[in-house]
């Protein structure tokens, strides 16, 4: 018995490099094979039930030698996609990939019969096949299935990309994610890590006494964030609706209603730009806890993210884009001005307190301080924009930036000690915002006044300013306990945990322009 040299194994057809005419020819040939299968009877049988998966077999029998496998035969039934194939006269090898990994089939004419073996020679890479047989080791020691019964379950009509090059076109990876998942173990591992991270978050929240809830995706009034919404129409109610930009105001209504710890993991939609850090449809986790404040939230969020890293990656010390990222150490905490002076030490305290100086300085960065969003801009807003220009992108290590100005924090509780400042933080890691949280504003009259100021900004042309939500004000008028709330960007968090440079790498089906 011999085993194929893997370097010589028949490669999958290199779709990414094939001219359209060649690919069409391959597809036509495969359609002819499918037509022949239809004439023979059931072309897509659905009566095979696997008893094992590849990874579990390798884990359980990876160290079992051939004498032991012969002494106690292990019968298996396994199915998957044929990724490699080598026909050698009366015996052949095939590498089959299921949802857990790959395993080798050893197929002989004597075991499966003349007709099946002859048919197998014409099966194509990408076909879904099944086998029943026993485990054994080849001469080179590879754990394999000695096939006794072989079937074709699903005919693949399109050739797979070349095994050794995969999908070379990055956009094609996003557009045809199903192919990317077939040929790229790295992609599969990324989304497995995403699932582990989300499971960790849910488990952590449940252990801390939070109740998972679902709130509306269609809102009569967009709220909970400064963003431009997607607009749609509800035919039955004959009214304009908005895809939600954030669930915040509904979750806080639940706090008013007596659910003291709630969280939601779901989609938000913002009709804004696309970039390596932004996708119009993205996943957020928001959580709210009565009788807490932003300091408690920072501690809780830090532990939450650290544990998610451990559960998804096995460690809190990661490598991101070639640089170490240590989530095991205590996260830094800086005010906006402290962060500016850390990375741009030329600015003095006096300059950072001078609005005219800041406006002049921001113009050097190309900031239009006459834009509508600067209508109510105080010194805090100007400091924040300077922070964004000078410091934000340099916050590699996990850092909570605190003390955000009231005028850009319309839902946050004002500080009792520092005028114009709120009890708010944003968490930055690798120069990206990962989380945003604050002690919640529960003063109905103050909230109504802030909404009115937001409406003034919207009327002046600021598309991202908030609307006035009268029902939310009514809810606050019933009384909301002191509360802390936070939102974590799941996609950006998973980017860190999987060393992914682009947000579209961690979204299964990111938005792209239509092919036509």
Curated annotation (Swiss-Prot):
Q: Which GO terms describe its molecular function?
A: ATP binding; lysine-tRNA ligase activity; magnesium ion binding; tRNA binding
The Enzyme Commission number assigned here is: 6.1.1.6
Is RNA-binding a UniProt keyword of this protein? no
Kindly name one Pfam family recorded for this protein. Answer: tRNA-synt_2
Name the major location.
cytoplasm
Q: Where in the cell is it found?
A: Cytoplasm
Q: Which SUPFAM superfamilies does the record cross-reference, listed alphabetically?
A: Class II aaRS and biotin synthetases (SSF55681), Nucleic acid-binding proteins (SSF50249)
For the ligand (Mg(2+) 1), the binding residues are 426, 433
UniProt KW keywords: Aminoacyl-tRNA synthetase, ATP-binding, Cytoplasm, Ligase, Magnesium, Metal-binding, Nucleotide-binding, Protein biosynthesis
How it assembles, according to the record, is: Homodimer.
Q: Which family does it belong to?
A: Belongs to the class-II aminoacyl-tRNA synthetase family.
- What is the protein name stated in its UniProt record? Lysine--tRNA ligase
User: Lineage, please?
Assistant: Bacteria, Pseudomonadati, Pseudomonadota, Betaproteobacteria, Burkholderiales
